[in-house]
Each structure stands twice: as C-alpha cells, then as structure tokens.
Design a protein with these regions (language model features):
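A short alpha-helical cap/connector motif
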Residues: 1-160
Length: 160
C-alpha cells in the first residue's frame, strides 16, 4: 500500500511539472495521467451521486456534530445543517469524479475511507468498483446515519 501512494505522489509530481502528458517518462505515470487526469467521460454514477448531493443541498435537517479530528478551530460540538456540511465539507464534484476514475483505474479489492462525512466520496468510490469492499469510517453518529441513508438510496451494498 505504501508503494501505491508513493507511485501516486510520483505521478502528481511529474504531472505538475510536465508541459504535456507526452513528457511523462514513467509508463505508470503516463497511464495514470491518461486514465484518471485526462479522462473527460461522463460515467453513469455521476448523475446519481450528484442527485443525492442536490437533495442534501436542499435539506435543512439539523445534525449533532461530534468532531474527533482536526476539524474547525471553533467548537468540536454543536448543530449544523446537512446543507452546510454538503456545501462546505463534502467532496466536491471534481474531487468525487477524480476518486471515481482513480478507483475505476486501480480496481482495488478493498478501499478504506477515513472521515466519511455525508458519504459523497464513499458513493463515488463504491460506484466505481462495485466488486470491491469499501470500509468507511465516520466518528460522528449523525453523519454516519446520513451517509448510510445516502448509500442505501443508490443501492451501494459493498460499503460497511
């Protein structure tokens, strides 16, 4: 696993300094750039995940926040709306699509996500590789409950 992240870091380093993808000398980096960074195809799951995101952006449901991580510099507890979390903390559309393409390209058997939030990133990952086991951890019980509801909406059963 460590080697995989080293290779991904190499990709980003080389890709950021290359003028074109053809100046990438590593075959791994070239393949990853083509399959993940240069891919502009619209996949079936994007529409479904974004429909769930739009539902969350319209939701005024209040959630109790329990933040065990770095979080904000303010309080670690309190209430927040689903809309605010979906707007400010969830994976963006671009990040989600990049996660989808990366998972689709790498075809892992197991994925681990730490800090699920509302499950947007999890939905992209689970939809990309339906045969993979996705383990998603969220410390805040209310966020985990919303994430589970969202995953059930898309019938993503490969997430635990």
């Amino acid at each position: 696993m460590k080697a995989f992240w080293f290779r991904v870091r190499q990709l980003l380093y080389f890709y950021s300094r290359a003028v074109t993808k053809y100046q990438l000398h590593s075959p791994f980096v070239f393949d990853l750039a083509n399959a993940v960074l240069e891919d502009s195809r619209w996949y079936y799951a994007f529409r479904d995940v974004e429909a769930v995101r739009n539902q969350m952006l319209a939701s005024d449901v209040q959630l109790e926040v329990v933040d065990y991580g770095a979080g904000h510099s303010g309080s670690r507890t309190g209430k927040v709306t689903v809309r605010k979390v979906a707007r400010d903390a969830a994976s963006s559309r671009r990040q989600g699509q990049m996660l989808f393409r990366l998972a689709d390209w790498a075809r892992p058997r197991t994925l681990l996500e730490l800090g699920t939030s509302l499950g947007i990133g999890t939905m992209y990952l689970a939809a990309a590789v339906r045969s993979a086991r996705v383990v998603s951890l969220e410390g805040c019980p209310d966020f985990a409950k919303v994430a589970r509801i969202n995953l059930d909406l898309l019938d993503l059963k490969n997430v635990s």
